[in-house]
Amino acid sequence: MGEYKTPGVYIKEKNAFGNSIVEVETAVPVFIGLTEVALDGTSSLLNKPVRISSMTEYNTYFGGAPTPQFMLSSEDIKADDKDKFLFCFPDSEKKTALKCGVLGHICTLYYHMVLFFANGGGTCYVVSLGGYNADFCELYSANKDTVFANIKKEQDITMVVVPEAVNSANCMNVYTDLLKELCDKQKYFALLDVPMEAGAKTEDISDSFGTGIGTTNLQYAAAYYPWLETSVLSDADIDSRVLVWNYNAETTPSTFSGDSKVDEYIKKCITMISTSKDAAGKELKADDIQQVKTDLHNALLQNWPQYKSLAKKVKDYLNLLPPSAAMAGVYTMVDNTRGVWKAPANVSLNYVNKPAVPITGKDQEVLNMPMTGKAINAIRTFPGEGIKVWGARTLDGNSQDS
């Protein structure tokens, strides 16, 4: 009963029976991807859904963030640099350039989990397919039957998210597998990302995605576009372990800062790292070499403008993430704060600076009402309102229930 504020007779009725309906969580996603480890003590957790509710629990079972690596070199400018390197920063004389390429592949599940919890995510499950050195699609193809069987054993999972799949050329095969093998039970809902291609028209992206996704169980999936420029990683995350020098490069800049003493110090660090010996010729231990790399990184950041610009570019590159994990957090937040009857739309996103591609009203028409009915939900920026999820349709857009 409420607080008594006026005199009178009040009758308080007691419930004769308990609630007949047990309250359950309605938005519990499972994330499938690559992690640093997958251990509960000494027991392997590979291919098994593990229930967590915070990044602290994630770190306990699955380890920390990956350390993506980018190979740097200072070389003569060549005609095919744009095809071979991710970034190129020419010097003032346009003869040499600071060049950067990706070493191996980049694992992103950790960053997606940060986005999920930042946008209202709570209880969820994580399935680790393997470590950071593995290939997502290879492990997915080899273990999907086991993974799907284990997911079906958990009663409270309602959504499926595979945020790393979109980085692969085979992502549409992953999506169609999910829709065919999991969503056929009408219990699971898949959140999908739309592949991005630089310079591509919105209509072409929509058509390509619609062609690849097929026609099976589209009413149990939603797709979101575009990708997001996030703030998951900070400047401090781009350190000497991420930016790795190729010390066998063809040339070395004659000057970094123009200050002879600074340049001498930087070249001294480069020599120590490349030879694994200090100035006196003594062998350096691994920890000592790493410290020299850190000192070199800090000196270059402070004294070489091209290096500082490249570090920012690398950070922005890593912070460009597809939206499915953030949307899983939004689904959870909306269900918990408003109720399952409220659509997960017209909601702001956290840890997001802006959509990677500005979506206009015309673009939204293309995404929202394609001829095939395979609707894609847009994420847009509005003046005075910020970034909003601007759509809540399933991929079965021609359905009356969409």
Summary of predicted features, one role per range:
Residues 1-402:
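Surface-exposed assembly/interface segments
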